[in-house]
């Protein structure tokens, strides 16, 4: 057995926080490829709803791979995966990409499944977005399954699972919290002075966000900041995609490197609360501003309050 086979044989499921922002997802994609991807993996299944960051993660894992659902390549026909027999000469495709949800508008599922298995049997690698939609038509599970919701799940299935439908359910149930947290995070940046926004670093927590300020504590009134954010949430102002580096909050431009990972409007942010004190991260010398979203946000706030013996509040 090869080294990669021995290394992966006991791996079932790993979990990461799904970062918000293009560069952080790229970095995580590189890390996942280095830790979990084997050169012998031929079928890679990626699962998650629109706006979850699947395509960005794939670009991080497979630099240089042409994604067939790109806005710039969406009209390129025929789909390379469906046109394998026309590839001649020395240089042929090694890795194919296919977005099943998109391609089902053009091609029957069983034809897509046949093309995927044909490529795999020819020793090619196929990266399949929305793998859960095509799995019932395939004769096999993926070598590596990746689910993107609030968390990123990396699974190496065996005959007993995990199966795509269970990964899909978990991602669908959790994605709304990631979208709410990202919108609340950008809303927080929107309401603080630009000089503080520009020096803030970003971290992730369950059902929430962290803005980390290095070296010194910002001069911010957190009670007032929460009131202003809640006022905008109550107004239910729209969150609009502008370009790959900006969104519009109520028509006002705001920088954002994950512009598609948002709720449609601020009114969709449920249960928002700020921790009313900065947490001091001794190890990295940073002051942490923590926000929580979701139905259990008060429970999370209470849990943080009980942790005062372990964390420094300032």
Segments and roles (model prediction):
Residues 46:
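Hydrophobic anchor at the beta1->P-loop junction of P-loop NTPases
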Residues 2-39:
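N-terminal pre-Walker A segment at the start of P-loop NTPase domains
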Residues 50:
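The conserved Walker
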Residues 55-68:
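A conserved segment at the C-terminal end of the G1
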Residues 69-132:
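Conserved nucleotide-sensing/catalytic segment adjacent to the nucleotide-binding pocket
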Residues 43:
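Walker A (P-loop) ATP-phosphate-binding motif of ABC ATPase nucleotide-binding domains
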Residues 165-314:
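Active-/binding-site microenvironments in catalytic and ligand-binding cores
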């Amino acid at each position: 057995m090869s080294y990669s086979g021995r290394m992966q044989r006991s791996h079932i499921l790993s979990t990461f926080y799904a970062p918000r922002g293009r560069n952080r997802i790229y970095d995580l994609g590189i890390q996942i490829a280095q830790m979990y991807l084997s050169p012998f993996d031929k079928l890679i299944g990626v699962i998650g709803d629109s706006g979850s960051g699947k395509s960005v993660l794939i670009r991080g894992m497979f630099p240089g791979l042409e994604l067939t659902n790109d806005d710039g390549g969406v009209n390129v026909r025929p789909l390379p995966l469906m046109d394998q027999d026309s590839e001649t000469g020395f240089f042929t495709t090694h890795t194919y990409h296919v977005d099943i949800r998109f391609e089902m508008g053009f091609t029957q599922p069983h034809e897509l499944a046949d093309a995927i298995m044909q490529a795999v049997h020819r020793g090619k690698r196929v990266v399949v977005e929305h793998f859960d939609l095509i799995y019932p038509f395939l004769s096999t599970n993926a070598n590596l399954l990746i689910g993107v919701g609030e968390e990123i799940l990396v699974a190496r299935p065996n005959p007993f699972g995990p199966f795509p439908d269970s990964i899909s359910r978990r991602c669908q149930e959790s994605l709304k919290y990631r979208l709410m947290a990202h919108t609340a995070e950008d809303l927080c940046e929107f309401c603080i002075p630009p000089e503080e926004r520009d020096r803030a670093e970003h971290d992730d927590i369950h059902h929430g966000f962290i803005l980390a300020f290095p070296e010194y504590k910002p001069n911010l009134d957190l009670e007032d900041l929460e009131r202003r954010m809640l006022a905008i949430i109550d107004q239910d102002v729209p969150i609009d995609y502008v370009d790959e580096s900006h969104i519009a909050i109520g028509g006002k431009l705001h920088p954002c490197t994950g512009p598609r990972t948002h709720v449609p409007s601020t009114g969709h942010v449920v249960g928002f609360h700020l921790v009313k004190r900065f947490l001091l991260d001794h190890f990295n010398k940073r002051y942490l501003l923590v926000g929580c979203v979701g139905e259990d946000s008060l429970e999370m706030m209470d849990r943080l309050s009980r942790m005062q013996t372990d964390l420094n509040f300032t």
